[in-house]
Amino acid sequence: MAMSRLRDLSLEIGSGELFGLIGPDGAGKTTLFRILTTLLLADSGTASVCGLDVVKDLKEIRRRVGYMPGRFSLYQDLTVEENLNFFATVFNTTIEENYDLVRDIYSQIEPFKHRRAGKLSGGMKQ
């Protein structure tokens, strides 16, 4: 039986506010962030970020909001470029389609794009 971790959650964070989300293991913190960053669909209810609906406006939210998980989900045997292309495909897009959004970062990884992800340092993986 699935548990509803985020039941009856109501949260509003104002512009410029500093906010921290804390709680015990399994409380739903990661699930909440994945929903708010459009990486996971909620089973029910609604969520918005910057006044944008996380389902209807997911492309605009992804343009504005970044999410860096504590663990990295790179495929160690693929190159940096292969990983980027794979994850772009997962999100039904391409690097070329979003190049204006990733140009600065992409130029920084250019020297490493043919390196296997397993050979990157932790900082480079981020």
Walk through the language-model features, giving the residues of each.
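ABC transporter nucleotide-binding domains
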Residues: 1-126
